[in-house]
């Protein structure tokens, strides 16, 4: 998270927790016409998977943090507040969140290039707490990336495990009218003499 996003997360985290929810992270996206402030919330880990975030949870958090933001005023200028569940491609904001998803695949964008690249996709292998780093398996080899160098990270959903993988049809679908391929015949077209 950016410094501004971290500042806002520290400010709003206790408010979200007072509602019985967890603030996973904050995205602060400044823009000339007005910034976007996006909060990702979830139910506490102890309540998963029995309970999931719903629209009512997002509305409650939005009302409470809107009032707090009006009083504290950490953002100068206009902004749009968005409160969202993390979704199946959940963003990862902390080392603890990476640790919860060891064994899953993720895609990450780095602040500074490592090994000539800024984008990586691979399986989260382990967390190196001493080095404050995440170890990924990328193209068959382990790559250690410092947590401070991770700009953005998201889980890559396993669509097959979720039962949402697109199904390939076993047979071709119905033909559309007018798309029948006719075999050429040696018969001349109606009303036309045969060329010899």
Swiss-Prot record:
The subcellular location is:
Cytoplasm
Q: Where is this region: Disordered?
A: 164-196
In this chain, composition skew of type Basic residues spans 173-182
Short name of any one Pfam family annotated for the protein: RimP_N
InterPro entries to which the protein is assigned, alphabetical: Ribosome_maturation_RimP, RimP_C, RimP_C_sf, RimP_N, RimP_N_sf
Q: What is its main location?
A: cytoplasm
Give the source's domain of life in one word.
Answer: Bacteria
User: HAMAP family per the record?
Assistant: RimP
Kindly give the NCBIfam families that the UniProt entry links to this protein: PRK00092.1-1, PRK00092.2-3
Primary role? Required for maturation of 30S ribosomal subunits.
Belongs to which family? Belongs to the RimP family.
Instruction: Return the protein name.
Output: Ribosome maturation factor RimP
In its UniProt entry, the species of origin is given as Xanthomonas campestris pv. campestris (strain ATCC 33913 / DSM 3586 / NCPPB 528 / LMG 568 / P 25)
């Amino acid at each position: 998270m950016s410094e501004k996003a971290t500042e806002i997360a520290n400010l709003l985290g206790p408010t979200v927790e007072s509602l019985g929810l967890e603030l996973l992270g904050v995205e602060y996206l400044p823009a000339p016409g007005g910034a976007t402030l996006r909060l990702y919330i979830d139910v506490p880990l102890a309540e998963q998977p029995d309970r999931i975030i719903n629209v009512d949870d997002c509305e409650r958090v939005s009302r409470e943090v809107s009032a707090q933001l009006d009083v504290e005023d950490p953002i100068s200028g206009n902004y749009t507040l968005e409160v969202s569940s993390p979704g199946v491609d959940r963003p990862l904001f902390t080392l603890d969140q990476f640790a919860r998803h060891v064994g899953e695949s993720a895609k990450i964008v780095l602040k500074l290039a490592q090994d000539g690249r800024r984008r990586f996709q691979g399986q989260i292998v382990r967390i190196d707490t001493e080095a404050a780093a995440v170890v990924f398996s990328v193209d068959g080899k382990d790559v250690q990336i410092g947590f401070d160098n991770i700009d953005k990270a998201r889980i890559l959903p396993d669509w097959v495990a979720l039962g949402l993988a697109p199904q390939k049809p076993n047979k071709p679908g119905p033909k559309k009218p007018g798309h029948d391929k006719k075999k050429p015949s040696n018969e001349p077209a109606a009303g036309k003499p045969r060329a010899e």
